[in-house]
Amino acid sequence: MIAEEREYATYSSMPSVSYKIIEHLMTNPKAEIIWKLLKYNDADAYTRPNLTQKEKAALIYKGEAIQADYRVFFDFMMDDAETEMNTILRIYPAEVYPINRVTGLCTINFEVFTHSKINHLSNYTTRVDVIIQTLIDVLNGADIGGIGVLFFDNQASRYDKIQTIGQKPYKGKLLKMSVNMG
């Protein structure tokens, strides 16, 4: 039996990339610190008890008109002016670079923003850096069901990087990771 070759890439998994990554972060024990730092604004947030699945789900934006109650979004940029001191995580497919007709490289952006007055933690680290490092720890090389293996690797994708973003009072970092898809 001859295997049938797909003629062209459809990138059918692209719309579910953000959700699948969040699903992985909600169930991975090493990602608990991310959820604590998103929910709690105090300098000792990392010492708080782990969140329940229900508490984590309550932080994820579901399309309501008011965004202020949420911390996790599946698109780019801050849509509304933030009036409270909090931390925000945005995860979305940013770019697709076709490699050939059946496969391409999808760059996933992870934007972490926090109000400058709550960025420093009592253990002499910063909220933004801890979240970015934990995202790499949990997701680099992880097989995200239905999407593929995420990677942070300059040899595999010259687009992977971390850069500083934001403006006062919200500062942040952008992590770019990649996944092959077709």
Residue spans of the language-model regions?
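Small/polar-rich, solvent-exposed N-terminal microdomains that initiate assembly or binding
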Residues: 1-100
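Short, flexible/disordered intra-domain loops and linkers
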Residues: 6, 119-126
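Soluble non-cytosolic domains of exported or imported proteins
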Residues: 12, 126-129
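Acidic-leaning, charged glycine-interspersed low-complexity segments
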Residues: 82, 128-182
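Extracellular structured ligand-interaction cores
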Residues: 86-88, 105-107, 170-176
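Residue-level recognition of well-ordered beta-strand positions that form the cores
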Residues: 92-94, 109-113, 176-180
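Short glycine/proline-enriched loop/turn "hinge" motifs that connect secondary-structure elements
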Residues: 97-105, 167
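Short acidic, glycine/tyrosine-flanked loop/strand segments centered on an H-E-D-like triad
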Residues: 103-120
